[in-house]
């Protein structure tokens, strides 16, 4: 996985990728970035293919403002990836957002995700009618023990949350 909107990524390269995306309408493409300001700049000037879902990463409360940069983009699905979730996000305005994925951090230096952080997001998604997908705990389990991420699983309070968004039909005039 890479960030197609990274500062070192040339917009001409993105043009060539989007050409292929347009030629393969049978597939759905998720474009995720930590640089939604670049995403916004590009897609306010360029067509967003119908089979593209645009998203941004929100790993901590410090970067919540990224949501505002994708909220009004004309795409069939706008989504947020809280991966890795490393702090409580507090109150979220999910208006205009269709899907939120929450994931704990993996790897040797992984930081723990607290259950209440994930539950806070899940409850807000439910309240605001946004699809919620809890992918996995990562290296730290809900019990605060570090182990293999597969052992920690993907249950949140004993439930699997694997909701997907409904795509909005784009109106072509």
Please report, for each region that a protein language model flagged, where it lies by residue.
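Core AdoMet radical
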Residues: 1-42, 47-87, 98-113
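Auxiliary Fe-S-binding modules of radical SAM enzymes
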Residues: 86, 91-173
């Amino acid at each position: 996985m890479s960030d197609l909107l990274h500062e070192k990524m040339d917009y001409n390269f993105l043009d060539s990728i989007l050409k292929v995306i347009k030629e393969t309408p049978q597939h759905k493409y998720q474009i995720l970035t930590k640089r939604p300001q670049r995403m916004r700049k590009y897609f306010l000037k360029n067509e967003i293919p119908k089979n593209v879902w645009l998203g941004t990463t929100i790993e901590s409360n410090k970067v919540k403002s990224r949501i505002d940069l994708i909220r009004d983009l004309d795409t069939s699905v706008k989504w947020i990836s809280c991966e890795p979730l490393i702090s409580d996000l507090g109150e979220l305005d999910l208006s205009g957002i269709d899907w939120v994925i929450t994931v704990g951090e993996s790897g040797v230096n992984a930081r723990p995700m607290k259950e209440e952080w994930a539950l806070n997001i899940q409850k807000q998604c439910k309240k605001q009618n946004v699809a919620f997908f809890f992918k996995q705990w990562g290296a730290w389990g809900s019990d605060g023990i570090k182990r293999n991420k597969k052992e920690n699983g993907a249950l949140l309070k004993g439930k699997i949350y694997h909701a997907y968004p409904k795509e909005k039909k784009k109106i072509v005039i």
